[in-house]
């Protein structure tokens, strides 16, 4: 996923939320995405771990 991609994010206790990627930072353990959400337009950071399905919080928006 890259900047300006539409994505969904997993948050605590609720359905996946739609947003837009503002920034991407890669690390050896995974990738951090700054995602703009309706109630957080400046963005919230989410981290996707490399080798963990449970640690995947950002995914592409299914069309």
UniProtKB/Swiss-Prot annotation:
**Top-level taxonomic group:** Bacteria
Entry's InterPro entries?
Dextransucrase_DSRB
In the record, the note on similarity to other proteins reads: Belongs to the DsrB family.
UniProt-recorded name of the protein: Protein DsrB
Q: Which organism is it from?
A: Yersinia pseudotuberculosis serotype O:3 (strain YPIII)
